[in-house]
Swiss-Prot record:
Pfam family membership, one: Chalcone
Misc. remarks from the entry: Part of the biosynthetic pathway for all classes of flavonoids, a large class of secondary plant metabolites, many of which are brightly colored.
EC number assigned by the record: 5.5.1.6
GN (gene name): CHI2-B
Major enzyme class: isomerase
Protein name: Chalcone--flavanone isomerase 2-B
Biological process terms in GO annotation: flavonoid biosynthetic process
Residues reported to bind substrate: 50, 115, 193
Annotated site residues (Important for catalytic activity) in this chain: 108
The family this protein is said to belong to: Belongs to the chalcone isomerase family.
Pathway(s) per entry: Secondary metabolite biosynthesis; flavonoid biosynthesis
Length: 227
C-alpha cells in the first residue's frame, strides 16, 4: 500500500478520522482512503449531519493503481468509473459514519434506504431479495438514536456482505456487530449513494481523489512497497 507518511489523519468538523484502524479481535488494519462531510441545503443554509470516512484493505491501492495511476486528482474526481472501481473492487471496505448532530435511527435509515432503493432500481438490481435486505437494513436501525459523536460502521466484503453493521457511542469500533446483511446489490448501493453518481458527500469524493492520487504517485516512485 502507500507509505505510512502519506496516510494521514483527516478532521471533519470535530470528528477525527485516524490514518489506520484495526477492529477488535482482528490483526488486519484498514487505511483511510478519504473522509468528508455529508449535509443538506435547508432554507438556503448548508446543514452538516455526518462525517463519513472510507477505510480500505491494504491491497486496494495496487488494485486501483493498475488502471488509475498517472491520473491527476482532478481526473479521478471527474471519473465515475474510478469511484465505481472503489465500490466494486475486490478488497474489503470499512465505512465510518459519525454524527455531527442528533439523528433518529428510523429517520436516518429511511433516507439512506430510499437512496439505495432508487439506485438499485435505476441499474436493474432491485428484486425480491433486495426488498427483503432493505427491510432487514431498516429493522437494524429502528430502535437506535444517534447523538453527536456516535457512529455507524459498515464493513463490506468483496463477496457482497454488508455485514457487521456496528453501532458505537463514539468513534471506537465495538467487538460485536449489530447485524449482518448478505446482499451484494445493497452493499454496493450503500457506498454508491455516498460517492457515486449522485453522492451525499461530494467532499468525501474529493478527499478520495486527492489522497489516492498521492498514493498512486508514491506507488510509482516505490514499486517495491508491499501491498
Amino acid at each position: 500500500m502507500a507509505t505510512p507518511a502519506s496516510i494521514t489523519n483527516v478532521t471533519v468538523e470535530f470528528l477525527q478520522f485516524p490514518a489506520l484502524v484495526t477492529p477488535p479481535g482482528s490483526t488486519k488494519s484498514y487505511f483511510l482512503g478519504g473522509a468528508g462531510v455529508r449535509g443538506l441545503n435547508i432554507q438556503e443554509e448548508f446543514v452538516k449531519f455526518t462525517g463519513i470516512g472510507v477505510y480500505l484493505e491494504d491491497k486496494a491501492v495496487s488494485s486501483l493503481a493498475a488502471k488509475w495511476k498517472g491520473k491527476s486528482a482532478a481526473e479521478l474526481l471527474d471519473s465515475l468509473d474510478f469511484y465505481r472501481d472503489i465500490i466494486k473492487g475486490p478488497f474489503e471496505k470499512l465505512i465510518r459514519g459519525s454524527k455531527l448532530r442528533t439523528l433518529d435511527g428510523r429517520e436516518y435509515v429511511r433516507k439512506v434506504s430510499e437512496n439505495c432503493v432508487a439506485h438499485m432500481q435505476s441499474v436493474g438490481t432491485y428484486s425480491d431479495e433486495e426488498e427483503k435486505a432493505i427491510e432487514e437494513f431498516r429493522n437494524a436501525f429502528k430502535d437506535q438514536n444517534f447523538p453527536p459523536g456516535s457512529t455507524v460502521f459498515y464493513k463490506q466484503s468483496p463477496t457482497g456482505t454488508l455485514g457487521q453493521l456496528i453501532f458505537s457511542k463514539d468513534e471506537t469500533i465495538p467487538e460485536h456487530e449489530h447485524a449482518v446483511i448478505d446482499n451484494k446489490p445493497l452493499s454496493e448501493a450503500v457506498l454508491e449513494t455516498m460517492i457515486g453518481e449522485i453522492p451525499v458527500s461530494p467532499a468525501l469524493k474529493e478527499s478520495l481523489a486527492t489522497r489516492f492520487h498521492q498514493f498512486f504517485k508514491e506507488l510509482e516512485a516505490n514499486p517495491n512497497i508491499e501491498n
